């Protein structure tokens, strides 16, 4: 398995953990590799590229700067202590904080439309190889509603409609939800999207397992 950047790998692990917990055992065996980031062990059944999106707005810019600098461990609640200890904030405190180890990850994020354009172009030219089922998993700094998720889904379908290699699924994860979009041909729009709510207990469990995997890899 290719060596992965520490901060990036946290999100790829978080994606695999949430997919397995919310969608079932099909995703249990995915391993963290490169091009794409998550793959079935056989290297051909399932491939999922993991990325992130953040809108270019003053609000998003301010959120990026709202890290945990200046907060001392033990002065606040358990979530803050974990962010300080492990360096990651996604899934905790409603997404208000960015941990120091994930700061550069989000600082390079593109708006949703631009990241979809980039990733669809890459899958179409074979950059991620050939898999029976190909997925794109996008972490969002903004809490999205179903309407915005549908817009992203429709835009992805339009981008790849003439491509020979394309994504079968689009997964959009914000702090509170996982939107699963079926991109296959021949489906009605109202049957393509399923929204899974992520409880506080699930967020805490996903976070804990992801950071524990980091300590194992070190």
Task: Label every PLM stretch briefly.
Residues 35, 45, 133:
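Extracellular structured ligand-interaction cores
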